[in-house]
Regions:
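Flavin (FAD/FMN)-binding glycine-rich loop and adjacent Rossmann-like elements that form
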Residues: 1-174
Length: 174
């Protein structure tokens, strides 16, 4: 399907080189993310860092809400550290922080790429690894997809680029 139309799209040359560049498992929690007009980070989802202790900070540009805790599986197998005594070490990158997040708001700008016009990314949003550990849930993606659809319709109706659609208009339609 990529021949002739999008030859730059394909499997990465440097990943899974021993398996014809195909992942061993279908389940992938995170993938590539855009660099957007805004970036969702840990302080945006954490109820204590900038929130009020019950929820993340308010964001006037929000178009979706998430509520799941920070949950990351290890990004690397066990290290070879001398601790614990078994010598196995800890799995690098494992985070299970369900008590630090409450409801948090996701701004429209995380779906709007800086480098391209005419496209929104409701799944591969502009976020840090830690923020994506909670955004990755299907209800959040559904809410972001709905917001993206509303933004696209407003962009067409108003004759403006997606980055210029007023967030208040998206919020009103949602």
């Amino acid at each position: 399907q990529t021949e002739g139309q999008s030859p730059q799209i394909g499997l990465p040359d440097d990943e899974f080189t021993d398996n014809h560049h195909l992942p061993y498992r279908l389940y992938v929690r995170q993938g590539r993310r855009i660099e957007g007009h805004e970036t969702l980070n840990e302080s945006d989802i954490h109820k204590d860092l900038r929130g009020n202790g019950l929820r993340g900070p308010l964001n006037a540009n929000s178009v979706a809400i998430g509520v799941y805790g920070i949950d990351a599986h290890n990004v690397q197998g066990p290290t070879r550290s001398p601790e614990p005594p078994s010598g196995e070490g800890a799995a690098e990158g494992t985070l299970h922080l369900f008590d630090v997040t409450g409801p948090y708001q996701i701004p429209y700008g995380v779906m709007v790429p800086k480098s391209h016009q005419g496209i929104l990314f409701p799944i591969g949003i502009s976020s840090t690894h830690v923020a994506m550990c909670t955004v990755r849930m299907e209800p959040v993606w559904a809410a972001l997809g709905q917001a993206a659809g509303v933004a696209a319709a407003l962009s067409m109706n108003q004759g403006v680029e997606l980055a210029q659609v007023p967030t208040a208009s998206i919020q009103q339609e949602l």
